[in-house]
Amino acid sequence: MEAFETFITNVTDFVWGGTWGDKTILPVGPVVVLLLGAGLYFMVKLKFRPLKRFIPALAEVWAGRKGDGDKSKITAWQALSTALSGQVGTGNLAGVATAITLGGPGAIFWMWITAIFGMALAFAESSLAIKYRETDKYGRVNGGPMYYIKNGLGQSWGWLAVLFCIGTLFSATATGGMVQANSITQSVQETSRAFSLPCQLSQPAIKGIRLVNNGVAKADQMNKADLAKVSACELETSNPDTLVIILEDVEGSDTLVNTASVEAGSNNLDTVIANWLIGLIIAALVFAVIIGGIKSIGSVAGKVVPLMAVAYIGIAFVVILMNASEVPQAFAAIFKGAFGWSAATGGFTGAVLAIAIRAGVDRGLFSNEAGQGSAPIAHAAAQTKNPTTQGEIAMIGVFIDTILICTMTALVILCVQGDFVNAAGEPVKYAYQAAGLEATAITNAAYASAIPGGGWVVTIAIAFFAFTTIIGWSYYAEQAVTYLVGEWATKLIRYIWVGVIFVGALTQVGFIWMLGGLANASMAVPNLIAILALSGVVLAMHKKNGDPDTEDGDSIMLKGEGVE
């Protein structure tokens, strides 16, 4: 198993970073080149339409709330919300923190670049999704990359459509389903444990042994005092099975920070709420939504996603205002790090630049999914006959996900100061510099340091973000299965999906997290090949439907085009 995990890690490192083990094969990963290259190509060829048409696109989003009355489809607003339900997930919390940890603050700049170019990719792929969607004999709309591959490139490209569908099922099961359910479970457990810590203040302690509520924990470092008392106790955020115990000797002359791992069999850290119960609740809620298909998913997403996004942005904005003096240095760190500046060397290094690019692009795609091919599956179900209108609405989703929500998370992490210690035992200001913290734990620590009960902000955000991601990706999985085996499997996959979610809530998903980068690439590569091959069609629609440099472009509509 270890050899297999090493192999998967090496493959993922190569496709995203160009490295294999300790060897550098390419300066940048091939998927990064393909993603940024395709984004730059479409941005230039579309004459920077995503930037020029940004304000009109916002108006189209607002107008899309009403729809055209076609009951076989969902409104443009609901399509955007469904796509956002898949885009806005744990990547907006854990992914941002991971990008900063791996690539430094400069990784955020490359997340922005990925998003800006991604807006052009979102326009291209969602426009194609409308043009080449199909309506089956039951009146259901089916669309997405597999359909614009089949109907746009022809049957000879069917193998690419199949590859995309397999990649979709891989990504849906791993990052869109099991990981999200597990994130909810872990978040609920960690927060509930925070209110029932198995630790009593000022409890006598003997060197090397911690007696805690009749359980036994062994301290790693207790070499400065033979007799000590507990002055503080909390769970280690990154590892809920570990207590961080701050000890003082009896005379109070020394303060010792010790990590105490709970001995196997101890009941100190028994889960407060059974994982199976949390999993059952998640599965039941998911089933209640997805059993009604895209109409039900779109209806729920159209209400929940805007509310959760506005609430999270609002809370993050307040935290940033409270730390406004740190904002200038946060942006300085982002821009310096983006181009390879290293605090350690006091200069610019190529290695720092490469790491920042890799981390930013990788986590950026994981968050906004632009170019991955998932969002156009949702946008294909929209009530519109104008492909480019929905394409413009789709690019707003990328902006909301990365430029707004991810940036808010990044600024909270980079601005909020707290009492943290790095691996060398030295005090540091920020959570992302601290030892023992990673992913969501960094974001959690930043909010907890900023406001009372800040950990609850992350817990609630994860619960909502992950839940909406689960329902969004259920539809993507359903569409992939429908394409591969036919309409008869549509309802069957919904029941299977509920089972996947329940298992994900109960399972340790560390290895599945490792598959995330590979899963994203397995969708992105076939999709990017397809939209580049169909770039002529995209540019023709662009010129016919609202070329920003053509005065009367907006008045021209595509009528009857597509395969509906």
PLM regions: where:
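N-terminal alpha-helical transmembrane segments of multi-pass membrane transport
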Residues: M1-T90, I100-A107, G118, F502, ...
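Helix-loop-helix hairpins and the membrane-proximal interhelical loops
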Residues: V11-S72, S296-A359
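Helix-loop-helix module between adjacent transmembrane segments
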Residues: F42-M43, S85, T114-G139, M146, ...
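Membrane-interface loop-to-helix entry segments
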Residues: K45-L58, N182-V188, A274-F335, W513-K543, ...
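Flexible loop linkers connecting adjacent transmembrane helices
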Residues: F48-A76, G95-I100, G104-I108, A122-Q155, ...
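Alpha-helical membrane segments and immediately flanking helix-loop junctions
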Residues: G69-L102, K131-M146, K150-G152, L163-L169, ...
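Selective recognition of specific alpha-helical transmembrane segments in multi-pass small-molecule
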Residues: F117-E125, I278-I294, V305-S325, R358, ...
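Extracellular/periplasmic helix-exit of transmembrane alpha-helices
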Residues: F123-R133, I315-A333, W341, T345-F348, ...
